[in-house]
Amino acid sequence: MRSRTYHDQSVCGPYGSQRTDCDRDTDAGSDTDVHGAQVATQIRTDTLLHSSLWVNIALAGLSILVFLYMARTVRANRARLIVGATLMIPLVSLSSYLGLVTGLTAGPIEMPAAHALAGEDVLSQWGRYLTWTLSTPMILLALGWLAEVDTADLFVVIAADIGMCLTGLAAALTTSSYAFRWAFYLVSTAFFVVVLYALLAKWPTNAEAAGTGDIFGTLRWLTVILWLGYPILWALGVEGFALVDSVGLTSWGYSLLDIGAKYLFAALLLRWVANNERTIAVGQRSGRGAIGDPVED
């Protein structure tokens, strides 16, 4: 499944003696297409894996339509910011799961020595990490605007969240060393601690002052509990200790977590925003640097 491409223009030229290497470049592109088709076929023939992806495609598409309807009457600026961030969650998920089911953002990687599946090719759904890099900041953005969090605090937490996702991707794709996989995992966990600290210790105070403490508390615990499931599943699944050595079962685990952490979260938030727009519009504070608020001199 490996291919080489040649990009040296001094080799790929119009002359007959240089034609062979240019043909290799074309063949490499063909090999990439074949590789993608093979991955898509592997996904399609694995019932557990295939169904875990299509369920989310269907739910993401349905959620987009339902959420647009729920938010149809929202007019206040801050409320619309929350709605916009929330709508991005299923939109990103739909794109992601389409990439996974077609094999575009998935592929086999060989597990390193000392791994339980050392030497075996395991299908990596690395596209999930790209999804989380885009969708989880939207969740935090919506929560931050709901709680009227200071812009600087919001930036730091979202930056930590992105770092968490990207180092998680590095952990999943590292094949040179089993120890380095876990090193990236620990760095990702450290970033996660920053996010948890904000959600559990800092932002609740902001939410109480903004008059959104009740709904923030519900969404905070939903987010914290479900997000904790991702690193636990990584450790137990094929990417970690392989105690669950089925890619299909691992994929279903991630998909179920996504359903709760994204669609359920978004539905609860949008319903509250639509019914409590005045609370968000008026707020309890101003001039604290939160996006959407006027800054007082």
Curated annotation (Swiss-Prot):
Keywords, in A-Z order: Cell membrane, Chloride, Chromophore, Ion transport, Membrane, Photoreceptor protein, Receptor, Retinal protein, Sensory transduction, Transmembrane, Transmembrane helix, Transport
A single GO cellular-component term on record: plasma membrane
Membrane-related topology note: Multi-pass membrane protein
Taxonomy, superkingdom: Archaea
Location in or out of the cell: Cell membrane
Main location: membrane
Sequence positions bearing N6-(retinylidene)lysine: 262
Cytoplasmic topological domain: 72-77, 148-150, 201-212, 276-297
Signal peptide: none
GO molecular-function term, one example from the UniProt record: photoreceptor activity
Segments on the Extracellular face: 1-45, 102-125, 175-177, 237-246
Pfam families the record matches: Bac_rhodopsin
Record field: transmembrane: 46-71, 78-101, 126-147, 151-174, 178-200, 213-236, 247-275
InterPro entries, sorted: Arc/bac/fun_rhodopsins, Rhodopsin_retinal_BS
Location of the region described as Disordered in the Swiss-Prot/TrEMBL record: 1-31
GO BP field: phototransduction
PANTHER family given in the database record: BACTERIORHODOPSIN _OPSIN, NOPA (EUROFUNG), PTHR28286
Role according to the record: Light-driven chloride pump.
Family assignment from sequence similarity: Belongs to the archaeal/bacterial/fungal opsin family.
Protein name: Halorhodopsin
Organism: Haloterrigena sp. (strain arg-4)
